[in-house]
Every structure is written in structure tokens, then in C-alpha cells.
Amino acid sequence: VEAVQDAGVVVTGAGGGIGAALARRFAAEGARVVVNDLDADRARAVAEEIGGIAVPGDASRIVEEARDALGGTVDVYCANAGLGSGGTEAAPEEVWANAWDVNVMAHVRAAHALIPAWLERGSGRFVSTVSAAGLLSMIGAAPYSVTKHGAYAFAEWLSLTYRHRGLKVHAICPQGVRTDMLTAAGSAGELVLAPTAVAPEAVADALFEGIAEDRFLILPHPEVAAYYQARAADPDRWMTNMNHLQQKWEADA
């Protein structure tokens, strides 16, 4: 994809899973890639593999260091680091706060650091790894579902606010992806996500198709579009069907 050749790219949460697949694909397309992960060893391993630059640490705090590593300019920022927090309304406030911080506020902080320069030069690309849970909700995972809705809303807001000023925004909303996060989703993940789970590389493929077509919403599982339309057309019917899944999950527990 010509749009990313020689671009300076940052991918957070890129020590494995979707992030590593994105980093590999950007590097294969000729981009210069900063690989970020909280796990410094994993970040360095992926960076070494793809000829990138490892900048480990909290995704919220590395924009300046990543920009310096790329020679002063970030062209593409992939806000990919995420927290798959399960639980109900009774989850401890710390769980809710951590999910909000990683899944939403890290995106806000990155945008705050990057957008002034992007607007000044009239170009920039912000990629948000959201989730189908940001469109549809996920059983057994209130903090995750709520904060992924927030991540989607922020990406949407960025796009509708700045698209006429050269900012490209992409929101990736996959269902199940074969990563550690799917394993951590436990029985709810096995019921809802595992049957149609795709490889992380399929998510990267979907993003690059979306970049080529200049599309905001990236759906590695195309059927999610129909689910989203069904939810909008008849919310009560949609939630009744989701509640049937909830009851099946409870019965199987």
C-alpha cells in the first residue's frame, strides 16, 4: 500500500497477537516501525524480527520517545494495546479504572500528543484497535464492552471532526482473534468468539484493505456489519437474542 511506504509507524501492544501482526505487515509494506509493549523482551523480539525499533513501556507515555526514534515524525499511530477486562457491574472499581485507562484514555492521550502536528501538515493516520464488543457488547465482560464502546466513539469523533483536515482514522472491530486475550476470555469466549476466530494476520489484512479503500470501519468478520444493522433496526430483539446466549453461558458454567 503506497500510503505507508517509508511511513513512520507506531504500534502499541505489539509484543504479540494483533499488534505483532500489524507491526509485521507495516514493516513488510516498507514502513519504519516502532514496536511498543509493556513487556520489553517481547517488544525487542518483534522489533528485531522486522527490523524495527523497540520502545517498551506504558503505551500512554511513549509518544515522544517513539517520535524521536522515528526522526521526529509519526505518520501512523496504531492504538492497539488493550485490556480484556471481564466481570459485571460488581467488578472492583480498580478493574473499571484500568480498563478505562488502557482502552480509552491511552487513545485520547496519544491523539492529544499527535494531532497538532498532523493538522499543521495536513496528514496523519490514527488506527484504533477496538473490538466487535465496541459495536455489539460481549457477555460476561461489562468493563471491556463499555470501554470498547468508548474507544469506538472516540475514533468516530476523531474522524468526523478532522477528516476534512487530512486526518485518516480507522476503527478495527474484530470478533474472536486467536490471541492470548481470547484464551483469557474463558468460557464466554469459547461460546461466542472461538467458533469464528481468525488469525491475527487476517486482522492486518483487513486493515490494509481498509487503508487502500480509505474506509473508517474495519471488519475482519464481515458478518458484524449485519449484526450491527440488526441491533440498530430492532434493539429489543437483538438484546433478547443476546440474553439467550447469556442464559446458555450460565447453564454451561
What are the language-model segments listed below?
Residues 131:
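Residue(s) in the substrate-gating loop at a strand-loop-helix junction
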Residues 29, 136, 157-168:
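Active-site-adjacent segment of SDR/Rossmann-fold oxidoreductases
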Residues 47, 51-72:
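Conserved amphipathic alpha-helix within the SDR
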Residues 82-97, 120, 140-143:
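Conserved mid-core segment of classical short-chain dehydrogenase/reductases
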Residues 8, 15-16:
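Conserved glycine-rich cofactor-binding loop
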Residues 171, 187-227:
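C-terminal helical subdomain
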Residues 111, 147:
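Active-site helix of classical SDR
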